[in-house]
Amino acid sequence: MSNRIEFDTAETGLRAVLKDYPEIAMKAIWESPEGLGSKVVWDKANERLKGKTISRASIINFLEAMREMGVLKGVEITGKGGHRWIYSPAMTEPQFKTFIAETILGNLKRDFPEETRRAIANVS
């Protein structure tokens, strides 16, 4: 995942912006506000994917993208095997959903100001 938000209009809920393993990773971290290392998140993702597996590098890349976006916090620690990150929520799930909505609406207003205002008025 890059540092951008992609909205899939064919999906609903968090799946509109997060695919299977990223959604599992975020839920695991929201369930553990004290923080988790990438290995624990990777283990949880592979356990919950039921028959499908994801690479640890994919998990690490996703967690880092979320940290760079400010969705997650990260603390680098040193331990057996070297340096590693512990990730914890910088945003709750409701705050993340608000962040997504504000980001998408902000971009729509920037790129299609009149059309976005009309669409919001029609939906409200």
Locate predicted features.
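Basic amphipathic alpha-helical segments that dock to polyanions
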Residues: 59-69
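Short helix-coil junctions and helix-kink-helix linkers
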Residues: 43-56
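Short alpha-helical segments that sit at the start of domains
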Residues: 1-27, 32, 92
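Short helix-capping/hinge SLiMs at alpha-helix to coil transitions
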Residues: 29-35, 48-50
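Short, cationic-aromatic polyanion-contact patches
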Residues: 18, 77-98
